[in-house]
């Protein structure tokens, strides 16, 4: 904290943490979220065939994190839909993205320089949602660290954790795409961010919430902008995760491969052994036939 104070970032961090996200940053969040929905196979056909189903999918993309968090906390899952301004903004973005004449709106927001700006703005909303989720869970469960992490993670992950439900609305069923089994970078980052904010809320992390919001938003924005610009699907955490998992949980894949190789070599040995045995039996039979002919 003394180092951060020496950098004179106090005012900047506090001002950034108090920066309102509505409507500018929220609109950016809706644009990028619904843009990703349009990238999904069959999403455009669905919007023409069943606009209601397409709109519901768009609302899940925009507000799925609130719905799932409310369900986990025992609150009404449709509570957030009482925010008329947000619903109208998200609906307007959905309509323009799918039904704007000549696809003008889609082409504008897909323009890479503008898209990178919108991606960075979306991460501002994501981190703010994680922080608010931790605060909300702490209000209900003061010492429930796991609950705080879970709610913060859900708030930050958005619709990713509800991807199977969203796919059902589109008439698609892909259980192998379960986000928990194959976490994307935003889902992993939201989990790690939720852990950091929970530690800060419990006063185990010696940093103010304003600083944590500022630096974690900076990290998320830089990573997502870089990944979007380079069309990368890798994770910056991959190197650390592989090392930590190897130490804590062992090289599961390597052991499995070694086990498989052992069986493979054993099978090869059995096959070669049986082949040699068959050749020996064949030669023995040939010798017996020759002996009979000679007799």
From Swiss-Prot:
It is found in: Sarcoplasmic reticulum membrane; Nucleus membrane. One of its GO terms (molecular function) is potassium channel activity. GO terms for cellular component: nuclear membrane; sarcoplasmic reticulum membrane. Keywords: Calcium, Ion channel, Ion transport, Membrane, Metal-binding, Nucleus, Potassium, Potassium channel, Potassium transport, Sarcoplasmic reticulum, Transmembrane, Transmembrane helix, Transport. Residues 1-11, 73-84, 166-178, 223-233 are lumenal. The chain crosses the membrane at residues 12-32, 52-72, 85-105, 145-165, 179-199, 202-222, 234-254. Residues 259-286 have a biased composition (Basic and acidic residues). Residues 33-51, 106-144, 200-201, 255-295 are cytoplasmic. A 1,2-diacyl-sn-glycero-3-phospho-(1D-myo-inositol-4,5-bisphosphate) binds at residues 122, 126. Channel activity is activated by a change of voltage within the sarcoplasmic reticulum lumen and blocked by luminal high Ca(2+) levels. Ca(2+) binds at residue 74. One of its GO terms (biological process) is regulation of release of sequestered calcium ion into cytosol. PANTHER family: TRIMERIC INTRACELLULAR CATION CHANNEL, TRIMERIC INTRACELLULAR CATION CHANNEL TYPE A. Intracellular monovalent cation channel required for maintenance of rapid intracellular calcium release. Acts as a potassium counter-ion channel that functions in synchronization with calcium release from intracellular stores. Opened by a change of voltage within the sarcoplasmic reticulum lumen. Belongs to the TMEM38 family. Homotrimer; conformation seems to be controled by binding to diacylglycerol (DAG). This is Trimeric intracellular cation channel type A. The lineage of its organism: Eukaryota, Metazoa, Chordata, Craniata, Vertebrata.
């Amino acid at each position: 904290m003394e180092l951060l104070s020496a950098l004179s970032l106090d005012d900047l961090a506090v001002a950034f943490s108090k920066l309102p996200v509505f409507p500018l940053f929220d609109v950016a969040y809706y644009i990028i979220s619904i843009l990703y929905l349009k990238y999904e196979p069959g999403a455009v056909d669905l919007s023409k065939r069943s606009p209601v189903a397409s709109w519901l999918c768009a609302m899940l993309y925009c507000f799925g994190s609130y719905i799932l968090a409310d369900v986990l906390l025992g609150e009404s899952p449709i509570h957030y839909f009482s925010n008329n301004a947000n619903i109208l903004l998200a609906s307007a973005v959905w309509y323009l993205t799918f039904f704007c004449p000549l696809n003008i709106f889609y082409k504008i927001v897909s323009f890479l320089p503008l898209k990178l700006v919108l991606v960075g703005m979306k991460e501002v909303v994501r981190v703010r949602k994680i922080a608010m989720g931790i605060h909300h869970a702490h209000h209900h469960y003061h010492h429930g660290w796991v609950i705080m992490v879970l709610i913060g993670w859900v708030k930050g992950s958005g619709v990713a954790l509800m991807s199977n439900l969203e796919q059902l609305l589109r008439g698609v069923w892909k259980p192998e795409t379960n986000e928990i089994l194959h976490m994307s970078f935003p889902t992993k980052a939201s989990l790690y961010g939720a852990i950091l904010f929970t530690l800060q809320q419990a006063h185990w992390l010696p940093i103010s919430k304003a600083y944590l919001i500022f630096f974690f938003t900076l990290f998320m924005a830089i990573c997502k902008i870089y990944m979007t610009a380079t069309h990368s699907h890798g994770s910056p955490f991959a190197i650390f995760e592989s090392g930590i998992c190897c130490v804590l949980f062992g090289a599961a894949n390597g052991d499995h491969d070694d086990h498989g190789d052992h069986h493979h070599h054993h099978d090869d040995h059995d096959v070669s052994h049986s082949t040699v045995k068959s050749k020996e039996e064949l030669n023995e039979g040939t010798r017996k036939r020759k002996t009979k002919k000679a007799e």
